[in-house]
């Protein structure tokens, strides 16, 4: 199960290793369609930790990283942003993104 990340634990969650964060909202259709893609990705790729931030419940991380459209996926490496994609993506695209930074 993909972990839900709060504003309070966001910085510690992204601090170490490769971490993919999905910025989403409950009312966002493409965000809902992305959830099973992320769950499948998590089951297949052990080199990345995956988390989700609900921008309505925890807006601070989204504001900090300038997220203006959802879903936005930001890839962090040891706490620093290394890449981002906006919109619904398939699993193969996300695997390529992760492999570029592994």
Curated annotation (Swiss-Prot):
PROSITE patterns: THIOREDOXIN_1, THIOREDOXIN_2. InterPro entries: Thioredoxin (IPR005746), Thioredoxin-like_sf (IPR036249), Thioredoxin_CS (IPR017937), Thioredoxin_domain (IPR013766). Transmembrane segments: none annotated. GO terms for molecular function: protein-disulfide reductase activity. One of its GO terms (biological process) is cell redox homeostasis. One of its GO terms (cellular component) is cytosol. The keyword Transferase does not apply. Gene3D superfamilies: Glutaredoxin (3.40.30.10). Disulfide bonds join 28-31. Participates in various redox reactions through the reversible oxidation of its active center dithiol to a disulfide and catalyzes dithiol-disulfide exchange reactions. This is Thioredoxin. The lineage of its organism: Bacteria, Pseudomonadati, Chlamydiota, Chlamydiia, Chlamydiales.
């Amino acid at each position: 199960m993909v972990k839900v990340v709060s504003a309070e634990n966001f910085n510690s969650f992204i601090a170490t290793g490769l971490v993919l964060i999905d910025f989403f909202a409950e009312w966002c259709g493409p965000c809902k369609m992305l959830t099973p893609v992320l769950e499948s990705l998590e089951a297949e790729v052990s080199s990345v930790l995956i988390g989700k931030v609900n921008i309505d419940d925890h807006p601070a991380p989204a504001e900090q990283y300038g997220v203006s459209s959802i879903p936005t996926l930001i890839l962090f490496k040891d706490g620093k942003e290394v890449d981002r994609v906006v919109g619904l993506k398939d699993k193969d695209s996300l695997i390529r993104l992760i492999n570029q930074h592994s």
